[in-house]
Swiss-Prot record:
General function of this protein: NDH shuttles electrons from NAD(P)H:plastoquinone, via FMN and iron-sulfur (Fe-S) centers, to quinones in the photosynthetic chain and possibly in a chloroplast respiratory chain. The immediate electron acceptor for the enzyme in this species is believed to be plastoquinone. Couples the redox reaction to proton translocation, and thus conserves the redox energy in a proton gradient.
GO molecular function, one term: quinone binding
Family, per entry: Belongs to the complex I subunit 4L family.
Protein name: NAD(P)H-quinone oxidoreductase subunit 4L, chloroplastic
Keyword NADP: yes
Transmembrane segments: 2-22, 32-52, 61-81
GO cellular component assignments: chloroplast thylakoid membrane; NADH dehydrogenase complex
Length: 101
């Protein structure tokens, strides 16, 4: 693929993720949009890593590191959402203020 196509795809994924993160009222949807943003960043990392020096795997290794951190973030985020849903019976962001108990 050409560099412009990959960058356009990455920018498109990033903008969809930002839009979804800003407009989302559901916590699970917000977590999914955050994962979409991280995947767009990973696509850029791998693309530029192969563009500048395809023999070194710095971008690929950093991308695997970001994927690992994103998996941990998703697990912790879903555990928090599950706990909030158990206590509040809702996963809406505006109803999740736990300080108003």
């Amino acid at each position: 693929m050409m560099l412009e196509h990959v960058l356009f795809l990455s920018a498109y994924l990033f903008s969809i993720g930002i839009f979804g993160l800003i407009t989302s009222r559901n916590m699970v949807r917000a977590l999914m949009c955050l994962e979409l943003i991280l995947n767009a960043v990973n696509l850029n990392l791998v693309t530029f890593s192969h563009l500048f020096d395809s023999r070194q795997l710095k971008g690929d290794i950093f991308s695997i590191f970001v994927i690992t951190i994103a998996a941990a973030e998703a697990a912790i985020g879903l555990a928090i959402v599950s706990s909030i849903h158990r206590n509040r019976k809702s996963t809406r962001i505006n109803q999740s203020n736990l300080l108003n108990k």
